[in-house]
């Protein structure tokens, strides 16, 4: 059973139509309903619940009561909700289990309401928005077969106790429920998301519509969910991002390597690490041996480091790989467009440091590197929220260092503190993007790892020739490339909601300039202009469709083309061009050389790739119907 619990000002519903052949019989009165000051329990009954319905009912009632007591709710509303799971129980079983949950809560003295089972319903809900307002629970009957899950993930889901704070640039550590979030709305949303740990995607985020409309990325029905296909424009954007991040990391001082995508389950060091890393794996059989698909570049880089001869003079030693792909078998209900995938591209750098002071110095440098990388893709600190995670002991011993990081970002950050260390790292930060559905996704991240050097036998020789274990920093300065695309598109979706013009960064725009002849008579001149732009390494195309000028301009606007160049008799005779600049809406006349200079200045320092589609619009296929 999956339960999503939302503490609400109210919920109201209205039955619209039957969703199954034999829905629960209801009266006219039951076709509508409302309850105020309520804990709403959205429930999916799963196939595995059929093995022991009574136990599932008992545990569900217990979990709901526990949350109701925490949020001080006397009213509870049971809402059948099939969208939390892809493995649903039979309708007859689900209906009976939900009825018993309803009765069990009533017997415990709660005022209980319920929505009817088996119908399409419209509903309105007003979530209270405090840190405990959104929580999720999973109930599995005893003896039910569970998927193989690493010990670290089990601990994270069952044993981990977190203490949440907000840390200000002034060094003030404030309990999260006592912090005044006025002026920090996104931080409030991020804190709620992190504390509730609800990762279920209830509806489609706006970036999905954009990635489909612009023919960038699409779902691939012929593959496992969470594996995507990229059309030419999307592949260009992804490729440029991959090149950009790789160049930044190599410029920082990393050595690029390449390692396998699968590893032996029985390798002693890998087996131990698997149980310390909170992720689900894909499993591959080769003969009678079992392998797992990598979920990061750690394994390959650690095995290279184990075999290398390393001196203290080589430290900090930085190694990097862009993994295309890494794999994590995320839960089906958590998959969401480009935000959460099962196959993804991860820029992954590991740094060996001789001691904690050197590790902290690298940590701070990589914090700044991550800010710089995100700035290049159009994301500033206003666009993301920071989480820093550590143990209570680390905080006491390194308080000034943590506060220094917060001063660098220049705004309050979320702190997750543990009484004891659950994972292989002692310190971690992430830059998290909060999207239009108030879901958060980690982009940049760095961790200081204190376990894996010894686990993998990675050593260096110190000044006295003695072997020592280094500390290891795990760094992704951008996060998964797909997540960067998600954040860019979600940011544009937000601008659209505010009535502003969306636009990709110029260096990432698949087409940077569109040349539009006012009629077929000026097509040759348009092609001449396009040739000059292409010769200057600017991505350009020509709209040669037999349509009115206004329609062509509207199409270019709809495609977010940064520069629209219109050419006709006047431009041909004068040797000038008429330009519409999307960034500020300005329309002006200029010489072609000036436009080239303007664009080249704006994209300086960023990678370039040629146009991903044919020059003429009339020669292009349509990838989506």
Swiss-Prot record:
GO MF annotations, alphabetized: ATP binding; threonine-tRNA ligase activity; tRNA binding; zinc ion binding
Chief subcellular location: cytoplasm
Record's subunit section: Homodimer.
Region spans: Catalytic: 206-505
UniProt: Zn(2+) binding residues: 298, 350, 474
Official protein name in the record: Threonine--tRNA ligase
Annotated cofactor note: Binds 1 zinc ion per subunit.
Keyword terms of this UniProt record: Aminoacyl-tRNA synthetase, ATP-binding, Cytoplasm, Ligase, Metal-binding, Nucleotide-binding, Protein biosynthesis, RNA-binding, tRNA-binding, Zinc
Cellular compartment(s): Cytoplasm
PROSITE patterns per record: AA_TRNA_LIGASE_II
Cofactor dependency: Zn(2+)
NCBIfam families in UniProt: PRK03991.1, thrS
Catalysed reactions listed for this entry: tRNA(Thr) + L-threonine + ATP = L-threonyl-tRNA(Thr) + AMP + diphosphate + H(+)
The EC number(s) this enzyme carries: 6.1.1.3
Similarity remark: Belongs to the class-II aminoacyl-tRNA synthetase family.
Function: Catalyzes the attachment of threonine to tRNA(Thr) in a two-step reaction: L-threonine is first activated by ATP to form Thr-AMP and then transferred to the acceptor end of tRNA(Thr). Also edits incorrectly charged L-seryl-tRNA(Thr).
A GO cellular component entry from the record: cytoplasm
PANTHER family from the UniProt entry: THREONINE--TRNA LIGASE, CHLOROPLASTIC_MITOCHONDRIAL 2 (PTHR11451:SF44), THREONINE-TRNA LIGASE (PTHR11451)
Region (Editing domain): 1-143
GO BP, one annotated term: threonyl-tRNA aminoacylation
Leader sequence residues: none
């Amino acid at each position: 059973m999956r339960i999503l619990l939302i503490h609400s000002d109210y919920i109201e519903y209205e039955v619209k139509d039957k969703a199954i052949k034999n829905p629960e019989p209801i009266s006219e009165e039951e076709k509508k309903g409302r309850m105020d000051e309520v804990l709403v329990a959205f429930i999916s009954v799963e196939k595995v619940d059929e093995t022991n319905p009574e136990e599932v009912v008992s545990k569900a009632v217990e979990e709901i009561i526990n949350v109701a007591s925490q949020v001080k709710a006397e009213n509870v509303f049971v809402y059948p909700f099939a969208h939390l799971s892809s493995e649903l129980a039979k309708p007859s079983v689900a209906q009976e289990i939900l009825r018993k949950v309803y009765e069990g809560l009533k017997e415990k003295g709660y005022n209980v309401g319920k929505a009817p089972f088996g119908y399409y319903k419209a509903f309105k809900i007003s979530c209270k928005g405090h840190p405990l307002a959104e929580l999720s629970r999973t109930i599995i009957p005893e003896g039910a077969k569970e998927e193989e899950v690493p010990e670290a993930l089990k601990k994270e889901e069952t044993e981990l106790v977190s203490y949440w704070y907000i840390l200000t640039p002034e060094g003030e550590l404030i309990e999260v429920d006592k912090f005044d979030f006025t002026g920090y709305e996104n931080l409030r949303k991020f804190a709620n998301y992190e504390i509730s740990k609800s990762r279920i995607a209830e509806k489609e985020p706006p970036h999905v519509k954009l990635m489909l409309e612009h023919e960038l990325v699409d779902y691939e029905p012929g593959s496992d969910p969470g594996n995507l296909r990229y059309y030419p424009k999307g592949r260009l954007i992804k490729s440029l991002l991959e090149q950009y991040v790789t160049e930044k990391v190599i410029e920082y001082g990393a050595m690029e390597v390449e390692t396998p995508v699968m590893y032996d389950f029985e390798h002693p060091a890998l087996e131990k690490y698997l149980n310390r890393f909170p992720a689900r794996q894909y499993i591959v059989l080769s003969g009678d041996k079992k392998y797992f698909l990598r979920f990061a570049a750690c394994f390959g880089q650690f095995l290279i480091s184990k075999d290398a001869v390393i001196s203290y003079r080589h430290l900090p030693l930085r190694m990097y790989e862009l993994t295309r792909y890494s794999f994590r078998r995320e839960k089906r209900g958590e998959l969401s467009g480009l935000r959460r995938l099962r196959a993804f591209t991860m820029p992954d750098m590991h740094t060996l440091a001789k001691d904690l002071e050197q590790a902290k110095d690298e940590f701070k440098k990589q914090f700044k590197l991550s800010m710089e990388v995100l700035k290049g893709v159009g994301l500033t600190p206003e666009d993301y929220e920071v989480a820093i995670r550590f143990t209570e002991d680390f905080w006491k011993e390194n308080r000034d260092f943590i506060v220094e990081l917060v001063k660098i970002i220049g705004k309050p950050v979320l702190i997750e503190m543990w009484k004891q260390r659950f994972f292989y790292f002692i310190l971690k930060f992430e830059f998290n993007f909060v999207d239009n559905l108030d879901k958060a996704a980690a982009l940049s991240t760095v961790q200081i790892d204190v376990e894996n050097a010894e686990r993998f036998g990675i050593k260096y020789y110190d000044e006295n020739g003695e072997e020592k274990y280094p500390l290891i920093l795990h760094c992704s300065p951008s996060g998964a490339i797909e997540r960067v695309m998600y954040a860019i598109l979600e940011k544009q979706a937000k601008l659209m909601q505010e009535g502003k013009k969306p636009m990709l960064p110029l260096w990432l725009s698949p087409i940077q300039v569109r040349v539009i002849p006012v009629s077929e008579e000026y097509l040759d001149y348009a092609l001449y202009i396009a040739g000059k732009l292409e010769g200057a390494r600017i991505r350009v195309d020509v709209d040669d469709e037999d349509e009115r000028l206004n329609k062509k301009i509207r199409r270019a606007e709809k495609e977010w083309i940064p520069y629209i160049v219109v050419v006709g008799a006047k431009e041909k005779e004068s040797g000038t061009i008429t330009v519409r600049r999307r960034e500020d809406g300005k329309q002006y006349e200029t010489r072609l050389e000036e436009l080239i200079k303007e664009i080249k200045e704006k994209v300086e320092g960023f990678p370039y790739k040629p146009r991903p589609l044919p020059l003429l619009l009339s020669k292009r296929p349509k990838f989506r119907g």
